[in-house]
Amino acid sequence: FTRAETDKYLKSYVDLGGFGKFLHSRKPTPIDAQTVIRMQMDTLYSFGVFDLSSPLTITIPDTGDRFISMMVINQDHYMPVPVAYKPGKHTLTQEKIGTRYVFVGFRTLANANDPQDIKKANAIQDQIKVEQASVGKFEAANWKRNLWIACATPSTC
């Protein structure tokens, strides 16, 4: 169930255009438009889904004292590496992460009530860099929907 559920979410981000690159939320996410229940109002989000058939290097920019974090989630919904907060290069491989596909999410602090601060946070988002010899392609399993739904209730799986 975990792999099917994670693949469903990965595909939803791929369908938004977030494959092999980062998509950036340029303003705080309204409460009624949150894709997960824990999104914060003082954070701008960046996200991407990557194929680790080829190593991926992500550069976290130097943000001074502004908070930024990078979270990595594999297809089994594990965080195989610690959340990263410091500037620098981080290389992800299939061996290190444990699955072919990975979700990478960034949070960048922004004052939701200050348009100038949001512009500064947007500039930081634009400095997040991705290096990869080949972006690959997204080929998640074709999970049988009825089995996947049944497994959402553990007693029926």
PLM regions: where:
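A compositional/structural signature for long, glycine/proline-rich flexible linkers
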Residues: F1-C157
